[in-house]
């Protein structure tokens, strides 16, 4: 597995924060690094496989990666990221207690993926731009300024995470997308889902298409197919069983959609013919 080292990304040995844009981010194999990062999804779509679990990522998603996490990007489509790298929560010169603002693992579950709305994403970009402007400065005031900006970034993300922000339709759409990640195998009635998240059906269709480039049903089908591909690679369940577990009532229809999406049949994936290394 590829290991990325801080010496290749941080501007100096005492720099606590570094900005690494990926515009765009191409497919990238599984890797980990000796630093932490906050991945800000600017726009586009892709699959982020995080510690073996696939997540569909779109604009407005924020991913918190620790130094022992492993992850990869695949099936990217105009995916643009800004990575905010930091050495460790306890490696800041002027800040302490940052860990309290970061996602916390509970009962083996780590909430690594958050969503923020468009207006918050704009504020995030402004903070990141200010940090970038100061990257070449190594004096104490500049270091302190960068760390203060990093603290402001964490506070903004914390306050604006979907759990705390349901004031507008964009935030409710983000909550809906997170709900789909957990309920992709359920039979989805879009009228009922729109009501559940206080959205009109027309607004749901329009905003989901704007954010993901896909219609709601197309997005759901892709999400189900991604989950199915993961199970084909990492479980012993039959193709038929996986189809049912991922929300498809007809395994033949599942196989047709699967081949159309990935250009490989479910059996090809199961046998590793796509070249994926497990």
Curated annotation (Swiss-Prot):
DNA-binding region as annotated in the record: 191-212, 239-262
Domain HTH araC/xylS-type positions: 174-272
Stored SUPFAM superfamilies: Homeodomain-like (SSF46689), Regulatory protein AraC (SSF51215)
Biological process terms in GO annotation: positive regulation of DNA-templated transcription; rhamnose metabolic process
Subcellular compartments: Cytoplasm
Site note Interaction with sigma-70, residues: 241, 250
Signal peptide, first to last residue: none
PANTHER family in alphabetical order: HTH-TYPE TRANSCRIPTIONAL ACTIVATOR RHAS (PTHR46796:SF13), HTH-TYPE TRANSCRIPTIONAL ACTIVATOR RHAS-RELATED (PTHR46796)
Function: Activates expression of the rhaBAD and rhaT operons.
Name this polypeptide is given: HTH-type transcriptional activator RhaS
Organism expressing this protein natively: Escherichia coli O81 (strain ED1a)
């Amino acid at each position: 597995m590829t290991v990325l080292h801080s010496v290749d990304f941080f501007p100096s040995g005492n720099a606590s924060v570094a900005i690494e844009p990926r515009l765009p981010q191409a497919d990238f194999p599984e890797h980990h690094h000796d630093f932490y990062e906050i991945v800000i999804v600017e726009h586009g779509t892709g699959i982020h496989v995080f510690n073996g679990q696939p997540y569909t990522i779109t604009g407005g998603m924020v991913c918190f990666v620790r130094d022992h996490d492993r992850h990869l990007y695949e099936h990217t489509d105009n995916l643009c990221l800004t990575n905010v790298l930091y050495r460790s929560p306890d490696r800041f010169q002027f800040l302490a207690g940052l860990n309290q603002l970061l996602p916390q693992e509970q009962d083996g579950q780590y909430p690594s993926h958050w969503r923020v709305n468009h207006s918050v994403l704009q504020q995030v970009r402004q903070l990141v731009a200010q940090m970038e402007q100061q990257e070449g400065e190594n004096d104490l005031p500049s270091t302190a300024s960068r760390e203060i900006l990093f603290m402001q970034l964490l506070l903004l993300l914390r306050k604006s995470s979907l759990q705390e922000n349901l004031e507008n339709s964009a935030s409710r759409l983000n909550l809906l997308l997170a709900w789909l990640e957990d309920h992709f195998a359920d039979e989805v009635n879009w009228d009922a889902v729109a009501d559940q998240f206080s959205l009109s059906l027309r607004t749901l269709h329009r905003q989901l298409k704007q954010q993901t480039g896909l219609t709601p049903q197309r997005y759901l089908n892709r999400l189900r197919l991604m989950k199915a591909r993961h199970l084909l690679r990492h479980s012993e369940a039959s193709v038929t069983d996986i189809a049912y577990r991922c929300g498809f009532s007809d395994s033949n229809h599942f196989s047709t959609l699967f081949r159309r999406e990935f250009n490989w049949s479910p059996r090809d994936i199961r046998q590793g013919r796509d070249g994926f290394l497990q």
